[in-house]
Design a protein with these regions (language model features):
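N-terminal targeting or regulatory segments adjacent to alpha/beta-hydrolase or S9 domains
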Residues: 1-150
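Residue in the alpha/beta-hydrolase core beta-strand immediately N-terminal to the catalytic nucleophile
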Residues: 265-267
Length: 279
């Protein structure tokens, strides 16, 4: 929550204290100012690395596979460094005094306004458009296991109305591999941290192509004043409704892409929130 507040504050000490809901003291203001200054430097570095990644992997320029690997390593290093500002913020010693979430619980009327129209025909929530969104494939590079690349497409759900990014791990020398669309847990941002347990490496070595979509409000889809996954909980009960209704449509796009790019079977799975989405 303190990290999300720093994102929203944009370097402003006053905005930071307003975000966390605590009164400022002169001593604490000085410490917060120094941390926010470093926070913005790391944010800028991460944005620059991410912009370079976007241009290299999804742009039209000629980039060697070695350069792509270096650009991806730089992106991940900078994002991990930016995410790690959480530990710096903890040194303020105020984490126990603030709410773990920025609550925005909707009223019954607000939820009803959005969902009452679907009560008679709930299937409409899960109906895909006649024309599925175009899926863009990035350039590829050799990862720790298999060939790695990303897919991007506009979410077909009006509940999120943003761009979905999914990382693909494709096994080597396997014609028409089976595909597993694998969802991550809540608050898990597998594509933005170093040192996480790789849940799919063994599957790729066994010849399975794994697609890992970023869930709504996680990773590249995180709102500017939130941390990854916060909105799912903080806006309950609407958050879970919106998430699952959107994710089902997004996974359907990935199922279609999988079937068009391989004759192998397609399976759904995941951990925690990802497992619930698969069900």
């Amino acid at each position: 929550r303190m990290w999300a507040a720093a994102r929203a504050a944009g370097g402003s000490v006053d905005k930071y204290f307003a975000e966390i809901g605590l009164p400022a003291t002169p001593a604490l203001e000085k410490r917060v100012a120094l941390i926010l200054q470093e926070f913005e430097v790391r944010r800028d570095h991460s944005k620059l690395a991410d912009d370079n990644w976007q241009d290299a992997f999804f742009g039209d320029g000629n980039v060697t596979t070695e350069q792509l690997l270096g650009i991806e390593q730089a992106r991940l290093d900078c994002r991990h460094h930016f995410n790690s500002m959480r530990s710096k913020l903890l040194t303020l010693g105020i984490s126990q005094k603030i709410s773990a979430l920025k609550w925005q619980v909707p009223t019954l009327e607000e939820v009803s306004t959005s969902y009452d129209k679907w009560l008679e025909r709930p299937i409409e929530l899960f109906e895909l458009p006649e024309n599925l969104p175009e899926v863009t494939k990035s350039k590829t590079f050799q990862g720790t296991v298999g060939t790695n690349y990303w897919l991007r497409f506009q979410s077909p759900s009006t509940l999120t109305n943003d761009v979905v990014t999914a990382r693909v791990y494709e096994p080597e020398n396997v014609k028409n591999p089976p595909t597993l669309i694998y969802g991550h847990g809540i608050c898990v941002e597998y594509d933005h941290w170093r040192g996480l347990i790789d849940e799919v490496e063994a599957l790729v070595k066994m010849g399975v192509r794994v697609i890992r979509p970023e869930a709504p409000w996680h990773g590249r889809r995180t709102p500017h004043d939130r941390f990854g996954g916060e909105q799912f909980i903080a806006t309950s009960p609407r958050g879970p409704f919106d998430h699952f209704c959107a994710a089902v449509l997004e996974w359907a796009v990935l199922i279609d892409w999988s079937r068009n790019s391989s004759t192998g079977p397609v399976a759904l799975g995941g951990t925690s929130l990802g497992s619930m989405t698969a069900h």
